[in-house]
Amino acid sequence: MASLMEVRDMLALQGRMEAKQLSARLRTPQPLIDAMLERMEAMGKVVRISETSEGCLSGSCKSCPEGKAACQQEWWALR
């Protein structure tokens, strides 16, 4: 199980990462990583970066089973 310091160190080494990448690299359940990142965001240590993918070739997000959530990526980086 990862600690807040290990999450911080991984972000420092990689620059920015998605929560699922952190979860896989640190071998920690994603709900725990999500909670740690939200806590670190509240402490002002990390920042959430939301990006909308422009690569949706069909432009039919309304009919996509995942909806627009599949086109939107959420990254985390140190502040």
Curated annotation (Swiss-Prot):
Binding annotation for iron-sulfur cluster: 56, 61, 64, 71
Sequence intervals crossing the membrane: none
One Pfam match: FeoC
Keywords associated with the record: DNA-binding, Iron, Iron-sulfur, Metal-binding, Repressor, Transcription, Transcription regulation
Molecular functions (GO terms): DNA binding; iron ion binding; iron-sulfur cluster binding
Gene3D superfamilies: Winged helix-like DNA-binding domain superfamily/Winged helix DNA-binding domain
Protein family: Belongs to the FeoC family.
Function text: May function as a transcriptional regulator that controls feoABC expression.
Descriptive protein name: Probable [Fe-S]-dependent transcriptional repressor
Taxonomic source organism: Klebsiella pneumoniae (strain 342)
